C-alpha cells in the first residue's frame, strides 16, 4: 500500500511567517533534514549535523513550540532521553509578484497544527 503525500498550502499569515523563518534558518533546516526519516536525540542531531549542541537545543525548542516536531521520550540507564522526528517531509515557497505562498507536505501520518 502506498501512502500518498498531501501538500497543504498555509493560509494563516502568522503560521506562514513561522515557516518562512524556519526555511530561512540554516540550523533549523539542518535539524529538520537530519530527522525527516529517523528520530534522533539532540546529541545525535548535533553529531550528524555538526551544529553546536546549545544551538541544537535552542532550535529544537523553537521547532517544538511551533509544532514542527514529534517528540517522544523514555528512560534508560543514563536517565531520561527525548527523540525528535520532523512532522515536515517537505516545504516550498512561491512568489507570484504580489503574494508569497508556502506549501508543506506532512511527514508520514503527522499533521501540521
Predicted regions and their residues:
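Short alpha-helical segments that sit at the start of domains
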Residues: 2-29
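Short capping segments at the starts of secondary-structure elements
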Residues: 26-28, 37-41
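A short acidic, leucine-rich amphipathic alpha-helix
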Residues: 44-50
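Alpha-helical residues within the helix-turn-helix
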Residues: 47, 64-65
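Glycine-centered, phosphate/nucleic-acid-interacting loop/turn motifs that mediate DNA/RNA or nucleotide
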Residues: 67, 73
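Conserved segment of winged-helix/HTH DNA-binding domains
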Residues: 77-113
Amino acid at each position: 500500500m502506498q501512502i500518498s503525500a498531501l501538500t497543504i498550502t498555509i493560509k494563516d499569515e502568522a503560521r506562514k511567517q513561522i515557516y518562512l523563518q524556519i526555511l530561512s534558518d540554516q540550523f533549523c533546516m539542518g535539524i529538520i533534514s537530519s530527522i525527516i526519516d529517523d528520530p534522533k536525540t539532540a546529541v545525535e542531531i548535533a553529531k550528524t549535523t555538526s551544529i553546536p549542541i546549545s544551538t541544537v537545543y535552542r532550535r529544537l525548542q523553537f521547532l517544538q513550540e511551533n509544532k514542527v516536531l514529534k517528540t517522544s521520550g523514555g528512560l534508560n540507564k543514563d536517565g531520561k532521553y527525548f527523540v525528535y522526528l520532523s512532522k515536515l517531509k517537505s516545504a516550498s515557497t512561491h512568489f507570484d509578484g504580489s503574494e508569497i505562498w508556502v506549501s508543506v507536505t506532512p511527514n508520514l501520518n503527522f499533521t501540521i497544527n
